[in-house]
Amino acid sequence: YSLIHDDLPCMDDDDMRRGKPTVHKAYDEATAVLAGDALHALAFEILTDGSVSSDPFVQAELVRCLALASGMGGMAGGQAMDMAAESARYDLPTITRLQHLKTGALLTASVEMGAILGRVPPDARSHLINYARDIGLAFQIADDLLDHEGDEAKAGKALRKDDEQGKQTFVSLMGADAARKQARALVEQACGHLAHYGEDAGVLCDLARYIVERDR
């Protein structure tokens, strides 16, 4: 739902997403708003379905985790900062906070909800949460690099819009080479958080490395 809403004319105003027309282009703006709303509600419906967990305390914790990541202390707050960026001059710490909220919060929630379902105690989740926060930031830096120097045909969407809108990004503030090094350093740091899991964390580390090597 967040991508549908992000593409709306009142937000990022994108016509293409992964090589296909965005929902408001394929249908209309009202349909896009309602489709996003419906998918948002569906997420909570799924989390409280007995096939996910029959334990009401686990269900409540899952709902709270996603709600916190979606609201003003998470994605919505990050999007509000992003909208304000068109008329503001953000420094690197502010951009980092923006992206931790806009991109990282939901990604972190995805990892934390897996820990909740796996019955990992709250005080033992820090390694997983730190891993998710690092790859969330690495993902956004990689996204900024793709927007700066990527191929629109591969990306399936318009690129270089942040530059056109005068928004600060990791690339504009750090330069492409430094941003690329930072993304890779974050990936290695993320994998370091999982070191005590041994080979069991291999898939998660592979995912982290894919995030910064992708071309779309």
Task: Go through each PLM region and give its residues.
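Mg2+-dependent prenyl diphosphate-binding active-site environment of isoprenoid biosynthetic enzymes
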Residues: 1-142, 148-192, 200-212
